[in-house]
């Protein structure tokens, strides 16, 4: 197919966000045999004398209309697309009646997060893909737009560290990368983890008064750890996780997630991922595996293989295209 992928490519960031989902979906769709034209929503919005996205919203919408006129895609795939107006989608429907329109969304779809901009777009979408499962999908099922769960995408050229191959020279037993700014519950959890760690070597970035890390600096931190902790804003939302989960599992780290997340539907417990019921349970399991690095690496290896086989950008791209064009979930290697 010929696809216009309109998302926040953030080309002005000079590669600091090279690991974002936009690029993984783009590459995966190309690997699946499609032609993909990139349209960077935010960068087009900033293309004004003030460099302001707010002032440039209208311009970005005008540019998207022109882009679809020039490319004549079979599919317009939107990523988040906060700045794309429903009126723009209505016009695109009118001018390109044979073109399918779909949108993927990888942020939370529960309060207090701001995702209200999705609802006015639904009447003009053929499909909506979100990285949340269960009952939270029901709120979008009030129009003919079809809705489906997708996992966060991985890319073997990005998540390529293969950290399960060598457990020597590790500075940390368990590392956590994620912000605790204005996240009091997360901060309290991490503080209690430190108090109860009792010999566990813990590493932090972007939290616990440690600076954030990006790009190679983040990879360097991961290389120094045997295991990693995957936390989301809420850990009781069916199948939801930030894309941190594939950055950890895809690189071969033995990854810990809350059992309440439901990620057991994607990863086999104690074989591909370790699940904990409480902070005390996390500490017990992390301590045990820190003393059994071969077992930790075996879990990391199995998780890495599952991530790249089942949840690659290509696999998810294949599913999205089949779903939006044919309305079928038959190619889905994950539960719906």
Region locations from a protein language model:
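Short acidic active-site motifs
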Residues: 63, 88, 113, 117, ...
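Conserved acidic donor-binding segment of nucleotide-sugar-dependent glycosyltransferases
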Residues: 273-279, 288-293
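Short hydrophobic patches on amphipathic alpha-helices
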Residues: 68-69, 92-93, 122, 222, ...
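A charged, aromatic-enriched C-terminal amphipathic alpha-helix characteristic of glycosyltransferases
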Residues: 32, 291-324
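Glycine-rich, highly charged phosphate/nucleotide-binding loops
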Residues: 50-69, 84
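Glycosyltransferases and closely related glycan-assembly transferases
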Residues: 65-76, 85-101, 141-143
């Amino acid at each position: 197919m010929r696809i216009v992928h309109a998302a926040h490519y953030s080309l002005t960031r000079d590669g600091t966000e090279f690991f974002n989902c936009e690029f993984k979906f783009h590459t995966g769709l190309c690997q699946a045999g499609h032609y993909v034209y990139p349209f960077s929503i935010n960068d087009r919005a900033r293309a004004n004398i003030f460099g302001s996205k707010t002032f440039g919203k209208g311009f970005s919408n005008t540019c998207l209309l022109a882009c679809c006129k020039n490319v004549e895609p079979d599919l317009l795939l939107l990523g988040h697309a906060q700045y794309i107006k429903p009126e723009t989608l209505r016009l695109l429907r009118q001018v390109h009646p044979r073109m399918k329109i779909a949108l993927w969304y990888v942020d939370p779809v529960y309060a207090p997060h701001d995702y209200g901009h999705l609802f006015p777009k639904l009447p003009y979408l053929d499909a909506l893909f979100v990285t949340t499962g269960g009952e939270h999908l029901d709120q979008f099922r009030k129009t003919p737009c079809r809705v489906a769960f997708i996992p966060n995408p991985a890319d073997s050229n990005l998540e390529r560290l293969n950290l399960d191959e060598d457990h020597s020279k590790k500075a940390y037993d368990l590392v956590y990368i994620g912000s605790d700014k204005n996240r009091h519950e997360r901060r309290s959890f991490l503080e209690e983890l430190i108090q109860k760690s009792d010999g566990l070597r813990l590493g932090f970035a972007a939290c616990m008064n440690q600076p954030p890390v990006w790009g190679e600096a983040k990879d360097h931190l991961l290389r120094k750890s045997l295991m990693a902790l995957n936390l989301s804003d809420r850990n009781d939302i069916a199948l939801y996780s930030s894309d941190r989960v594939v950055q950890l599992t895809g690189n071969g780290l033995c990854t810990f997630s809350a059992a309440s997340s439901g990620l057991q539907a994607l990863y086999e417990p104690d074989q591909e991922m370790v699940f904990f019921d409480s902070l005390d349970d996390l500490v017990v399991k992390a301590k045990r595996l820190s003393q059994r690095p071969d077992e930790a690496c075996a879990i990391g290896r199995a998780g890495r293989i599952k991530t790249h086989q089942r949840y690659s950008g290509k696999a998810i791209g294949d599913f999205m295209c089949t779903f939006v064009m044919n309305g079928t979930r038959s190619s889905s290697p994950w539960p719906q």
